[in-house]
Amino acid sequence: MPDAEDVRRIALSLPDTTEKTAWSMPTFRVAGKMFATLPEDETSIAVRCPKEERDELALAEPEKFWIADHEAQFAWVRVRLAALEGEDELRDILADSWRQAATPRLLEAYPRLGLPPAG
């Protein structure tokens, strides 16, 4: 099961990522835009996720994903670390969120992390 140190290590391994404390918790940012937070209890993370996809995830896997009341109007979802299958799943979730916050220049510079090709 991934833990808070895995979140920090993986998030900071993504290009141009910085850590900044906000609301008394670690947040991870790319180009100044937040893409992940690690709430104080360190049992979950919040990540960017398009609202439609977020709603589907929360319905399909409520033991893993949920929408915090104070984040309902935003395109964010909570993820229970204990419910993840391992570091690979955590890495995929953090990379997906990073892509949503990264600049087009970063997406072009890191095609492995960039958006999937059209077609």
Residues of each region from the PLM?
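Charge-dense, helix-prone N-terminal extensions
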Residues: 1-119
